[in-house]
Amino acid sequence: MSLKDSAKIALSLMDLTTLNDNDTDEKVIALCQQGKTEFGTPAAVCVYPRFVPIARKALKAQGTEQVKIATVTNFPHGNDDIDIAVAETKAAVAYGADEVDVVFPYKALMAGNEQIGFELVQQCKAVCQASNVLLKVIIETGELKTAELIRKASEISIKAGADFIKTSTGKVPVNATLESARIMLETIRDLKVADRVGFKAAGGVKTAEEAAQYLALAQEILGHDWVNSDHFRFGASSLLTNLLAALNGQANQKVSGY
C-alpha cells in the first residue's frame, strides 16, 4: 500500500483529540473545523466531557455530524474508585458522548489487584451499554511496561466488556509503541474476540509513516478487512497535519502535541 493510501485510511480512523487543561469552546470548535478536510473526516473527535455539546453543535454546523464524539473518564490517573469512575461515565453519557474512553485502574493491577479493574470496566460498560455508547478502556501501557501486565490488563478489560482496548492517555512519558500494540492485538486474536473488540493506539503516533506501521501490524495479526473504524482508531492531534502533508505530497512537519 502506498503512503498516500495508508494516510487516507489513517485519517478516517483518527479520534482527533484535544485534552488540554486550557481547552476552551473556541479550541474545540477549531478542532472540529480541522477535521473537515478535502480527504474526508476522522472517525471521531475526542474532548473533555463538558465540551461534548459544543463539539456536537460545531460538527452539525459544518455538515460533518457523522463524526462521532468521544470523551474521557477516570482520566488521566486511572484511580481505583469505582463509584467516581461510574459517576463520571454517567455524566459523559448525559452530555451526549457517543464513545467513552475510561482509564483502567492500572496502578491497582501493578499492585496485584485484578478484581478492581474488572469491576470498574464492567460497571462503566453497563452505563454505556444502556445508552448504546461505545466503551474504550485505556490500559496505560507505558506505565504497565511489561508484556505480562499489558496482556493481563487487556484480558481483564475485554472480559469485563470493553469495546476497544486503548494504549495510553497521552499524559505519561511513554505512550503508544508498536511493541505494546502487538501484545494488545495478539490478545484480541488469542481471545477470539476480533469480531467485537477493537484497538486504539494513542499518543506518540505523529507521522504518516508511523501510522502506516500500526496499520500494517494490525493487518498482519487480525487481517486486512479488520482494519476499519469499527475496530481500529488512532488517538492523536498532531498526526492530522502530517497525514494531510503526505496526502498532498509534502514532507512531514515538526508538530507538537498528542
UniProtKB/Swiss-Prot annotation:
Q: Which cellular compartments is it found in?
A: Cytoplasm
Q: Does the keyword Cytoplasm apply?
A: yes
A molecular function annotated in GO for this UniProt entry is: deoxyribose-phosphate aldolase activity
Q: Which reaction does it catalyse?
A: 2-deoxy-D-ribose 5-phosphate = D-glyceraldehyde 3-phosphate + acetaldehyde
What keywords tag this UniProt record? Cytoplasm, Lyase, Schiff base
Primary localization = cytoplasm
Q: Known EC number(s)?
A: 4.1.2.4
GO cellular-component term (any): cytoplasm
Q: What Gene3D superfamilies does its record include?
A: Aldolase class I
Catalytic center residues: 101, 166, 200
Q: Which cysteines are joined by disulfide bonds?
A: none
Give the metabolic or biological pathway: Carbohydrate degradation; 2-deoxy-D-ribose 1-phosphate degradation; D-glyceraldehyde 3-phosphate and acetaldehyde from 2-deoxy-alpha-D-ribose 1-phosphate: step 2/2
Task: Fetch the Pfam families from UniProt.
Answer: DeoC
- Biological process GO annotation list? 2-deoxyribose 1-phosphate catabolic process; carbohydrate catabolic process; deoxyribonucleotide catabolic process
Superkingdom field: Bacteria
| Alphabetical list of CDD domains matching this protein | DeoC
Give the HAMAP family listed for this entry.
DeoC_type2
Similarity comment: Belongs to the DeoC/FbaB aldolase family. DeoC type 2 subfamily.
Its annotated function is as follows:
Catalyzes a reversible aldol reaction between acetaldehyde and D-glyceraldehyde 3-phosphate to generate 2-deoxy-D-ribose 5-phosphate.
Name used for this protein in its record: Deoxyribose-phosphate aldolase
Q: Which organism is it from?
A: Actinobacillus pleuropneumoniae serotype 3 (strain JL03)
Upper taxonomic lineage: Bacteria, Pseudomonadati, Pseudomonadota, Gammaproteobacteria, Pasteurellales
